[in-house]
From Swiss-Prot:
EC number: 6.1.1.4
Gene: leuS
Reaction(s) catalysed (UniProt annotation): tRNA(Leu) + L-leucine + ATP = L-leucyl-tRNA(Leu) + AMP + diphosphate
This protein's UniProt keywords: Aminoacyl-tRNA synthetase, ATP-binding, Cytoplasm, Ligase, Nucleotide-binding, Protein biosynthesis
Protein localization: Cytoplasm
Alphabetical list of InterPro entries matching this protein: aa-tRNA-synth_I_CS, aa-tRNA-synth_Ia, Leu-tRNA-ligase, Leu_tRNA-synth_edit, M/V/L/I-tRNA-synth_anticd-bd, Methionyl/Leucyl_tRNA_Synth, Rossmann-like_a/b/a_fold, tRNAsynth_Ia_anticodon-bd
Protein's name in the database: Leucine--tRNA ligase
Binding site for ATP: K641
Motif window: 'KMSKS' region: 638-642
Organism: Janthinobacterium sp. (strain Marseille) (Minibacterium massiliensis)
GO cellular component: cytosol
């Protein structure tokens, strides 16, 4: 055994060993050594995008998963930890353009490198189950599901709004539009309506919402709230304003302007209606109003993202059109509002300035009437400024509302809904913020949509026998539109129905389709004739999912939806895919920058900066190492390329070893909280591992000489050491169960301190206690630092008795070891802590009272005979003087 810790040698040896025995290959229905079924546990990290290199967020995520795997495996579970690649998407196209290579070439090269990085981390991944989203054997089943969902009406086609770059002749994602211009061309972006495919996720809205509350107790409350809010159930009234506006002799929208409101009690306060720029009434009015035409064009340049629209300036323009109020018969002016989405509800809203803050601001801006129709006792309405109580539906009563005066919110809604229903102009309705999922993307690098366009037959689904529709991997995007439109071999095909020349669909699927079910494909790897098979029934639902909070809504919601569709198709037997969810915190680091005269900031990596510290070790100034000139200290932020504050995991592994990187990321913070990077912390983790190795080396002879021993006969000093090791084991085991790995590392450090500090003689008793303590210590530390503990386990001979540490039985707390002949009891005098005493564990009340009264510290605070002495057995003596 080497006397010095060499991470490179230790870790290579461990990797070679694990590879030789195919250590992490998982099988279904695994048995224990007694032939009994092991309990399965499926733990999975959200699959990464193959961007080229792992970042510290990856390291933290996968280490959490790996620690969980190793702990559970030692506890007898049949554990699965797979890995795959979210390999389609826009970043690959951008990188391909920058490097003039096909996205496929860039993607596969990145995957190869990132796999070597994962291997160097010692992750317990079953690579036989690897899936890659851009491989035809995977996306074939995206296409198969698309066709099944199309057949059942769950997928349908309609026009949708996209960002169109007129120079590059391509569709841009919202994040590629900067200040209304294309990120590459700088051209003013146009909103275009094009046919797209949608999935009816709204058909599952109620079930998705119900299951958030009733079937996801193992999810963080924060995520469940985010999902509920995203689904956004609203109970209200949908009703129509009427009109006689006609075009070419036909009433527009059958003479009705439909709106939805959750505040039907304020219907008598309507002073205007606002419609989306794309609404039929807006289009009609614009034909005779050039100014309105320009305004609508301006609106279409804006964002269609709700978050953006919520914060942008609300603008409007009157159409010159009026609709009739369904209850009063009064004419209400119709405006075009840039804040109204055509894709939300009916693309129109009623305006009640007196009781809606947005409408109030809009009315003030454009000098529109404000009519209060709700009164809150003790309050006086004024149209000068908005007050929160104007929107109070809990305490308000209707006023200025005729027959509804005096009614509270619910009474008014019920009465108004009934009257609207009687008129045939409205009804109570439940709506959802959630909208159907647009899965079409006008991009190349994605799953081809399996549709063929025929002039005679229309849109024809690709026959199942012809799947997969294989995406050509030789295209190099140049920014001038989807290269599939120029790929003759892909594009031209015979119609499956009539046999005439036809054309393939060139849109591809949203990459969220890929990530909606990949975790099930891990369970049925290499299944060529089914999307999932019986192996999926064994592993799913997943026991523990691990990923960032940024995926709390879209990915997780789509995965839940996809699972329910698969259930309804008879492919799976469960409702929810992920039983437990852990959202790990971000990894933070310091930021440093210089700002030029124009305000542009240049960011410098922390490794290139030297700090000047004050006498308390706090940074007071910083200079760039290369030129010695000052840089600004920007504070601690999430590691990112934009702030140039990332740390290369591979550099850390090369310098210190994977176990150091793993130990630091687990120790520095609880898994669900943010982790602040610390070079000193990394050094500290490495020092600890060197101590671990040195202790193992120094105790090798003692362990070799250890033999079976009756622990009941141990001397008191040996019992004390054993008691402490088992107390720490008990704590660590509990922390592993709670996924509090930072305190597991603390327990490991405490145990090493305890073992190092033990002053025991060279006797069979000492050898037995140290050997047991060291074997417990190595198993506690193993899930976090598997390489060094594997090496020491082998070198010290523990493998002979317990087998490979991977499958060594988890140490059990010995209740006898925790027993103490004496206990410490605290003493309070008049409610204040004044001292403590050591008494026999079985001491009677009189003995305890006598010992407490004899304590020197206590005697200072009592005069004469105490009024009362209360003994709380095993804990406390309370003296009332």
């Amino acid at each position: 055994m080497q006397d010095k810790y060499s991470p490179a040698e230790v870790e290579k040896s461990a990797h070679d060993h694990w590879q030789a025995i195919d250590a992490y290959k998982a099988v279904e229905n695994a048995k224990d050594k007694n032939g009994k079924d092991k309990k399965k546990f499926y733990a999975c990290s959200m699959l990464p995008y193959p961007s080229g290199k792992l970042h510290m967020g990856h390291v933290r995520n996968y280490t959490i998963n790996d620690v969980m795997y190793r702990y559970l495996r030692m506890n007898g579970y049949n554990v699965l930890m797979p890995m795959g690649w979210d390999a389609f998407g826009m970043p690959a196209e951008n990188a391909a353009m920058a490097n003039n290579v096909p996205p496929a070439q860039w993607t596969y090269a990145n995957i190869d490198y990132m796999k070597t990085q994962m291997a160097s981390m010692g992750l317990a991944i079953d690579w036989s189950r690897e899936m890659t989203a851009c491989r035809p054997e995977y996306y074939k089943w995206n296409q198969w599901m698309f066709l099944k969902m199309l057949e059942k009406g769950i997928i349908y086609k309609k026009t949708g709004t996209v960002n169109w770059d007129p120079i590059d002749q391509t569709v841009l994602a919202n994040e590629q539009v900067i200040d209304g211009r294309g990120w590459r061309s700088g051209a003013l972006i146009e909103k275009r309506e094009i046919p797209m495919y949608y999935a009816r996720i709204t058909d599952y809205a109620e079930e998705l919402l119900d299951h958030v509350d009733n079937k996801l107790p193992g999810w963080p409350e924060r995520v469940r709230i985010m999902q509920s809010n995203w689904i956004g159930k609203s109970t209200g009234v949908r009703f129509a304003f009427t009109h006689d506006i006609a075009e070419e002799g036909k009433l527009i929208n059958d003479g009705k302007l439909w709106v939805f409101t959750t505040r039907a009690d304020t219907i008598k306060g309507v002073t205007f209606c606002a419609v989306a720029p794309e609404h039929a009434l807006a289009t009609f009015a614009a034909k005779s109003n050039p100014e309105l035409t320009d305004f609508i064009a301006e609106c279409k340049l804006g964002s269609v993202i709700e978050a953006d629209m919520a914060t942008m300036e609300k603008k409007g323009m009157p159409t010159g059109l009026f609709v009739k109020h369904p209850l009063t018969g009064q004419l209400v002016e119709v405006w075009v509002g840039n804040y109204v989405l055509i894709t939300y509800g009916d693309g129109a809203v009623m305006g009640v300035p007196a009781h809606d803050e947005r409408d109030f601001a809009f009315a003030q801006k454009y000098v529109l009437p404000i009519h209060p129709v709700i009164d809150v006792p003790g309050k006086t309405f004024s149209d000068v400024a908005w007050h929160e109580w104007y929107g109070d539906k809990e305490n308000g009563r209707c006023i200025n509302s005729g027959k509804y005066d005096g009614l509270n919110y619910q009474q008014a809604v019920d009465a108004i809904a009934a009257d609207l229903a009687e008129l045939g102009l409205g009804e109570k309705k439940i709506t959802y913020r959630l909208r159907d999922w647009g899965i079409s993307r006008q991009r190349y690098w994605g799953t081809p949509i399996p549709i063929i366009h025929c002039k005679d037959c229309g849109d024809v689904p690709v026959p199942e026998k012809d799947l997969p529709v294989v995406l050509p991997e030789d295209c190099v995007p140049d920014g001038s539109g989807n290269p599939l439109n120029k790929h003759e071999k892909f594009l031209h095909v015979d119609c499956p129905q009539c046999g005439k020349p036809a054309r393939r669909e060139t849109d591809t699927m949203d990459t969220f389709v890929d990530s909606s079910w990949y975790y099930m494909r891990y369970c049925s790897p290499n299944s060529s004739d089914a999307m999932v098979d019986s192996r999926n029934d064994y592993w799913m639902p997943m026991d523990q999912y691990i990923g960032g909070i940024e995926h709390a809504v879209l990915h997780l919601l789509y995965a839940r939806f996809w699972t329910k569709v698969m259930r309804d198709f008879g492919l799976v037997k469960f409702d929810e895919p992920f039983t437990n969810l852990l959202t790990q915190g971000m990894v933070l680091n310091e930021t440093y920058f210089r700002e030029d005269a124009s305000g542009k900031k240049t960011w410098f990596n922390p490794a290139d900066v030297q700090l000047q510290l004050d006498d308390k070790g706090r940074p007071v100034s910083a200079v760039l190492s290369s030129d010695g000139k000052a840089v600004e200290i920007g504070g601690t932020e999430k590691m990112s390329k934009s702030k140039n504050n990332g740390i290369d995991p591979q550099a850390q592994i090369d310098q210190y070893g994977a176990d150091t990187a793993r130990l630091f990321t687990m120790f520095a913070s609880p898994p669900e909280q943010t982790l602040e990077w610390s070079g000193a912390g990394v050094e500290g983790a490495n020092r600890f591992l060197r101590r671990v190795w040195a202790y193992g080396y120094n105790q090798a002879a003692r362990v070799a000489n250890a033999s079976a021993f009756d622990f009941a006969t141990l001397p008191e000093a040996h019992k004390a050491l054993r008691r402490e090791t088992h107390k720490i084991l008990q704590q660590a085991d509990n922390d592993y169960k709670r996924i509090q790995y930072n305190t597991v590392v603390s327990a490991s450090m405490k145990m090493l301190n305890t073992l190092e500090a033990a002053k025991l003689d060279d006797s069979p008793a000492s050898n037995a206690v140290i050997s047991e303590g060291l074997s417990i210590f190595l198993r506690i530390l193993n899930p976090v630092a598997p390489h060094i503990t594997h090496a020491l386990w082998q070198e010290l001979g523990f493998a002979k008795d317990h087998g490979d540490i991977l499958d060594a039985p988890w140490p059990q707390v010995d209740p006898a070891a925790l027993e103490q002949a004496e206990i410490e009891m605290m003493i309070q005098v008049n409610g204040k802590l004044r001292g403590s005493i050591i008494v026999a564990k079985d001491a009677d009340k009189a003995s305890i009272e006598a010992a407490a009264l004899a304590n020197e510290s206590v005697q200072k605070f009592i005069e004469g005979t105490p009024k009362k002495i209360i003994v709380v057995p095993g804990k406390l003596v309370n003296i009332v003087a």
